[in-house]
């Protein structure tokens, strides 16, 4: 019975990924965090065992405050100056080579809702984390999170981890929305000699006529 109890206790794990805009200083307990002003995206990962809630005390240029991870799982703490948004990535072996105007509009609608914090839910696996807050991303501490300004490498093996998440600084998302909006102003025509079933076909782009 004692062995079972010890095994159960050792299974508890809390992983906290910290985002900040400058150097992150952590004391030996990993529970007292100091961040400074800056403009460079910095990440630091902290690991904790045990069933007790983890409370981090943060000392920052915007004041002192605490954040808490009350249960096991993978958490994201935003100690930066901008909101970060992100979601679960649906990975697979099929590569889509074309995007229709309808699909483009769906992406735009989704991104516009995301930057407003709309339709955010645990069930949808999407997140809107304002500065100074922490959120549980997943119960799977073996998941992989790619942070702001860090693209998912083309050679990354998504099968090596149970889940993949991508997060963006909210400014990045506005840039993406702008680019997609510009793309939505164009129409695509099939290159001469190509068929509708040819996934490798090339399209000629023309400005959409009003």
Give the ranges of each region predicted by the language model.
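C-terminal motif of bacterial Sec signal peptides marking the signal peptidase cleavage site
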Residues: 5-8
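Structural motif
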Residues: 16-25
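Short, solvent-exposed S/T- and G/P-enriched segments that are highly enriched in secreted/extracellular
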Residues: 31-48
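Solvent-exposed, non-transmembrane interaction/regulatory regions
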Residues: 38-39, 59-65
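Short Pro-Gly-centered beta-turn/loop motif in secreted/extracellular proteins
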Residues: 44-57, 68-72
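Extracellular beta-sheet/turn segments enriched in Thr/Pro/Gly and aliphatic residues
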Residues: 65-116, 163-210
